[in-house]
């Protein structure tokens, strides 16, 4: 039987909580699954995180920003995104975008009301920082 160590469990919880905003009216949040975390030897003090974000039909993420660099790749469906003051753009499966640290991500949603969408996300963030931070209301 595998033992889960408390620091690992707390770190994982600390990463997931900022990625899962509160939702009202019975809506379900996007589903975030951390695939791997590594501390690259050539980037002391940094942590590389790979995860997936799955959206059901019509689902969206709350407005947020990332303290580290982010690269997002659409694995399935289509995702509409708005970064900083740019116009909204819809990315289809096979397309990708980059977010510089601190970029305001005000729109991130499944572009379809009938089909799911899924992103593969890679982020390089300072050790001890979450991948995603909610925007202050």
Positions of predicted regions on the chain:
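A short, N-terminal "cap"/entry segment at the start of jelly-roll beta-barrel domains
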Residues: 2-9, 13-49, 82, 98, ...
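Short acidic-glycine-tyrosine-enriched beta hairpin
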Residues: 40-44, 55-56, 85-102
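A short beta-loop-beta micro-motif enriched in histidine and acidic residues
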Residues: 46, 58-73
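Structural recognition of the beta-strand scaffold that forms the well-ordered cores
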Residues: 63, 71-73, 96-99, 121-123
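Short beta-strand His + acidic residue motifs that chelate non-heme Fe in jelly-roll/DSBH
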Residues: 63, 81-82, 99, 105-112
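Glycine- and acidic-residue-biased ligand/ion/polar-headgroup-sensing regions
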Residues: 68-85, 95
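N-terminal leader/targeting pre-sequences
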Residues: 87-88, 102-108, 131-137
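Ligand-binding loop in jelly-roll beta-barrel domains
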Residues: 103-129
């Amino acid at each position: 039987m595998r033992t889960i160590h408390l620091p690992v469990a707390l770190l994982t919880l600390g990463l997931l909580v900022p990625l899962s905003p509160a939702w009202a009216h019975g809506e379900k949040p996007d589903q975030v699954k951390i695939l791997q975390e590594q501390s690259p030897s050539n980037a002391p003090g940094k942590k590389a995180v790979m995860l997936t974000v799955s959206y059901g039909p019509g689902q969206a993420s709350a407005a947020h920003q990332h303290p580290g660099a982010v690269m997002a790749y659409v694995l399935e469906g289509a995702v509409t995104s708005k970064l900083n003051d740019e116009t909204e753009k819809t990315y289809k499966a096979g397309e990708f975008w980059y977010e510089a640290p601190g970029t305001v991500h005000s729109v991130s949603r499944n572009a379809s009301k009938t089909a799911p969408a899924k992103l593969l996300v890679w982020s390089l963030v300072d050790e001890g920082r979450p991948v995603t931070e909610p925007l202050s209301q």
